[in-house]
């Protein structure tokens, strides 16, 4: 069984640096999906960004995080944020969490230890 370990925390607190170091040390690591989507949208002139269409952006992030989750094959894999991070941002912005998203979070559990970078 794969141990999927999430590294979470506020923006700019070192999550990506930790992920890069773990990758250098040979661990399978998954990048921050939100950043990739935003960069792609800015490059292509798209509007699926958190400041233009948070609902659509969140759906895309959750879908891509689910793909990351389901692709795990190694004994231990690290994630720069997880599915639950997306739901937390929705709650913060008072956006209702759909039953689909709740189901995805409930049916795709990460390892019970989560690392949170300090602010």
Regions found by a protein language model. Give the residues of each.
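ATP-dependent NMP and nucleoside kinases share a basic, alpha-helical "lid"
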Residues: 79-119
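Conserved glycine(s) of the Walker
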Residues: 14
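Conserved substrate/cofactor phosphate-moiety recognition/catalytic segment
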Residues: 20-64
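Short amphipathic alpha-helices and their capping/turn segments at secondary-structure boundaries
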Residues: 57-74, 99-110
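Conserved Walker
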Residues: 17
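The conserved Walker
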Residues: 11
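Residue-level preference for the first positions of well-ordered beta-strands
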Residues: 4, 75-78
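Hydrophobic anchor at the beta1->P-loop junction of P-loop NTPases
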Residues: 7
């Amino acid at each position: 069984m794969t141990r999927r370990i999430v590294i979470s925390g506020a923006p700019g607190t070192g999550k990506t640096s930790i992920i890069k170091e773990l990758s250098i040390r040979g661990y399978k690591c998954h990048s921050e999906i939100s950043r990739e989507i935003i960069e792609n949208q800015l490059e292509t002139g798209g509007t699926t960004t958190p400041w233009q269409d948070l609902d659509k952006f969140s759906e895309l992030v959750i879908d891509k995080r689910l793909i990351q989750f389901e692709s795990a094959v190694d004994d231990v894999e690290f994630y720069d944020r997880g599915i639950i991070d997306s739901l937390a941002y929705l709650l913060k912005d008072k956006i209702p969490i759909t039953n689909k998203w709740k189901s995805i979070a409930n049916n795709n559990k990460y390892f019970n230890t989560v690392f949170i970078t300090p602010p």
